[in-house]
Amino acid sequence: MLRLLSSLLLVALASGCGQPSHNPSSRVVNGEEAVPHSWPWQVSLQYEKDGSFHHTCGGSLITPDWVLTAGHCISTSRTYQVVLGEHERGVEEGQEQVIPINAGDLFVHPKWNSMCVSCGNDIALVKLSRSAQLGDAVQLACLPPAGEILPNGAPCYISGWGRLSTNGPLPDKLQQALLPVVDYEHCSRWNWWGLSVKTTMVCAGGDIQSGCNGDSGGPLNCPADNGTWQVHGVTSFVSSLGCNTLRKPTVFTRVSAFIDWIEETIANN
């Protein structure tokens, strides 16, 4: 196991994780179109219906063979594929990689409860049926060290193809929005999220910018001290009152709380 984990780390380091070839500009409500391939670990998780595949969630490529997404994005009754290197949905731009997912290669956290999203553990891993080919449009995400907590106001970006407004349309092109981190002390206040937020989550936004339906499972991208980007969050839920409700920031599964589970799942499969 230790050998495997070391090799995974070496793969990430050798590929230059978290360093997009196309720098991001300084679904996503009131966001903006992302620079093409500026979040090259962003994936589109798609499910099959009536003979065609449809975007349902985002995700992050964390090794050439594994994607990190949300537990609520996964249903064992569905057939999935992952699209890497995507920018504009429905348009073949030449850099996409479409990779099928085998039914037995969906790994949802064992403590995830689909009837209680606020209970936490909304995280899953998807094993690709073949390895991703890394390049300008497809690169690996860096993950944060286990246990790392971002400070209040840390500047992070959500990215995805989620709805542009509550009950609004899905965008064709990848969107991004700046969502400053809201620390647990603030996010758990009674007039914010209260008891719905756990310490294994991270909040970000809470004003006019937020995630929305279709962004689920995608990354919260945060700058690290070494100049790389790290995926600190997996998009989990927003308020039932609307995607951009005041004092209801987007809630993410905190990746640094699940590093051990991620490493063990990859090592054992």
Swiss-Prot record:
<keyword id="KW-0865">Zymogen</keyword>
<feature type="signal peptide">
    <location>
        <begin position="1"/>
        <end position="16"/>
    </location>
</feature>
<keyword id="KW-0720">Serine protease</keyword>
<dbReference type="GO" id="GO:0006508">
    <property type="term" value="P:proteolysis"/>
</dbReference>
<dbReference type="InterPro" id="IPR043504">
    <property type="entry name" value="Peptidase_S1_PA_chymotrypsin"/>
</dbReference>
<feature type="propeptide" description="Activation peptide">
    <location>
        <begin position="17"/>
        <end position="27"/>
    </location>
</feature>
<dbReference type="InterPro" id="IPR001254">
    <property type="entry name" value="Trypsin_dom"/>
</dbReference>
<protein>
    <recommendedName>
        <fullName>Chymotrypsin-like elastase family member 3B</fullName>
        <ecNumber>3.4.21.70</ecNumber>
    </recommendedName>
</protein>
<dbReference type="InterPro" id="IPR033116">
    <property type="entry name" value="TRYPSIN_SER"/>
</dbReference>
<feature type="disulfide bond">
    <location>
        <begin position="212"/>
        <end position="243"/>
    </location>
</feature>
<feature type="disulfide bond">
    <location>
        <begin position="156"/>
        <end position="222"/>
    </location>
</feature>
<feature type="active site" description="Charge relay system">
    <location>
        <position position="72"/>
    </location>
</feature>
<dbReference type="InterPro" id="IPR050850">
    <property type="entry name" value="Peptidase_S1_Elastase_sf"/>
</dbReference>
<dbReference type="InterPro" id="IPR018114">
    <property type="entry name" value="TRYPSIN_HIS"/>
</dbReference>
<dbReference type="GO" id="GO:0062023">
    <property type="term" value="C:collagen-containing extracellular matrix"/>
</dbReference>
<keyword id="KW-1015">Disulfide bond</keyword>
<keyword id="KW-0732">Signal</keyword>
<feature type="disulfide bond">
    <location>
        <begin position="57"/>
        <end position="73"/>
    </location>
</feature>
<feature type="active site" description="Charge relay system">
    <location>
        <position position="122"/>
    </location>
</feature>
<comment type="function">
    <text>Efficient protease with alanine specificity but only little elastolytic activity.</text>
</comment>
<dbReference type="GO" id="GO:0004252">
    <property type="term" value="F:serine-type endopeptidase activity"/>
</dbReference>
<comment type="similarity">
    <text>Belongs to the peptidase S1 family. Elastase subfamily.</text>
</comment>
<feature type="domain" description="Peptidase S1">
    <location>
        <begin position="28"/>
        <end position="267"/>
    </location>
</feature>
<dbReference type="Pfam" id="PF00089">
    <property type="entry name" value="Trypsin"/>
</dbReference>
<keyword id="KW-0378">Hydrolase</keyword>
<feature type="disulfide bond">
    <location>
        <begin position="187"/>
        <end position="203"/>
    </location>
</feature>
<dbReference type="InterPro" id="IPR001314">
    <property type="entry name" value="Peptidase_S1A"/>
</dbReference>
<dbReference type="InterPro" id="IPR009003">
    <property type="entry name" value="Peptidase_S1_PA"/>
</dbReference>
<feature type="active site" description="Charge relay system">
    <location>
        <position position="216"/>
    </location>
</feature>
<keyword id="KW-0645">Protease</keyword>
